[in-house]
Each structure stands twice: as C-alpha cells, then as structure tokens.
Amino acid sequence: MPPRPKEYGAVIFAGICFGTTGTAQALGPKGASPLVVGAARLLIGALFLCGVHRLLHTGGQRLKAADLLSGGVGVALYQLSFFSAVRSTGVAVGTLTAIGSAPALTGTIAFLITKEVPSRRWFAATMITTVGIIFLTGAKGFSHVNVLGVLEALGAGASYSLFAVASKRAMSGGASFTETMYKIFGFGAILLLPCFALGKSHFLFTGSGFLMALWLGLVPTAVAYTAYGYGLNKIKVATASTLVLAEPATATLLAAVVLGERLNAYSWLGVSIVVAGLIYLSRE
C-alpha cells in the first residue's frame, strides 16, 4: 500500500514534537549534565513507548539483532551529541545543524545499506528545505558559533541517520512500528544507564529538572517516535528524514515565543521556505 497523507502528516507532527527539545532543555536547570539529560529522556521515553506497544497490541516479526544493535547505538549517541551541542553552541544553531544535516546523511546511508533510492521529489524538497535552513542559520549569525558544538551537532545528525535506517530496515523485515521503537529505545536507554553515575543527576530531583525530563521523555520521545514510526512504516527513510525538518522551524518559532529570541526577516523567510519544502514533499 502506498503512503497516504496521514503517514506524511504523522512524520511532520513528529518533527514538530522534536522541535520542543532544545527549548525544554533551555528552560530546565542551568548546568544540567547533557549525559544525564539524554539518559533520562531515553529511559522515560522507552517506558512510555513500551506502554504504547502493550496498549496497541501490534503484532509482527521480532527485530533482528543487527537492527536492534545499530538502532540502539544510534539513538544513544544522538542523545549525548545533541544535548552536548545545544549546551555548547545554543538551541538554534545546535538544532539546525543536527537535523539539517540528517536528510543528506540518511539518504546516503540508506542507499549504501538498503539500496533505497530517493525520489526526484525528495532531492528537490531537500534542496528547498536546506535553503530554508541556511536562512535560519544565517539569521542567527555566526559570531557565537562554537566549532566543537557544530561538530557535536553533525555527530547527532549522523547518529540519527543510523537510527532511522536501522528502524526502517526492521519494519521492512516485518517488525511492527511500536515494537521497533520501544525495543530500540529500550536498548539505547540501557546503554546510557552508566551516565546517571558518571554525571551529576541531582537536578532531576528539582521541580524544573523533573518537569524537563518528563517532557523530554513524553512529548519529543514517546509521542513523537510513535508518530514517526507510524509514518516511517510506509514512507522511504530519506523522505521521512526531510519531513522531520519541521523540527528546526518549530525550534526557531519556540525560541522566539518562549525564550524571547527576536526573529528577523531572514528567520521568517527561512521558516516559510522550510514549510514550502515540506508541503511539496508531502504531496509526493
């Protein structure tokens, strides 16, 4: 069955949920360890995803060990590199670089591993949205960009791509989208358990720290990846990686509305171009 508008809409909705991540971290306790933040997000998210799987009772084949391993490693590394990038170079630049690099990286990895060939519309839409992200990034300026933070964000993009390709391969092999998500995130959470001992986790026992961890585990993880998995089950992984570029547009708007960052004409133009690219791709 070919993908329907609701599959595209589900992935775009997931991208909107992803876009709340950086703002939630910025509103959390200052100096919170990115190791612990990432580990807490995965642990809470995995528990919620397990509940979703049990609630929906979706069947399917068991995940292959290779998909579980590569997906879990990818999602674990993403948490560490993304939250470190946001702390190093800020919400906007960290988010834009991480998710902005993902479509090209995902398309390349998917072709090398699964021989999945992206469509012409994907190439065009990815170029359109990339132009939008360039405007968004340029609008923030580069005077305060941390080179290490940018490298961490690129690492997050590569880690996300590894997770996405592994998840798609698992579902193509017969695993249900709910089982794929909860098992990969569960394995990733296990990998990050040592972070609670290595990093300072006392902030989790404060009001703002607890709410931040709960939000990160519930909205941009459990809710987002349930929607993402539902859409990815029918959509090419490269297409999905471009549709989630709703994330940087959302992050930019939230940075203005919630964090008080001022948007100039370049910001609005960038958001508009990204939205146009997403609409174009969703009509595939």
For each feature predicted by the language model, list its residue ranges.
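Glycine-/small-residue-enriched transmembrane alpha-helix faces in small-molecule transporters
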Residues: 1-39, 73, 77-81, 142-169
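C-terminal-most transmembrane helix of multi-pass membrane proteins
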Residues: 2-4, 40-43, 50-51, 209-211, ...
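Hydrophobic alpha-helical transmembrane segments of multi-pass integral membrane proteins
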Residues: 5-10, 36-51, 124-131, 148-155, ...
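Specific transmembrane alpha-helical segments of multi-pass solute transporters/efflux pumps
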Residues: 21-22, 56-94, 98, 107, ...
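Hydrophobic/aromatic residues within transmembrane alpha-helices
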Residues: 28, 37, 41, 85, ...
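Specific alpha-helical transmembrane segments that line the substrate/conduction pathway
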Residues: 36-47, 83-116, 156, 237-256
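Helix-helix packing/entry segments at the starts of transmembrane helices
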Residues: 40, 94-101, 167-189, 221-257
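Hydrophobic transmembrane alpha-helices of multi-pass small-molecule transport proteins
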Residues: 49, 75, 118-138, 157, ...
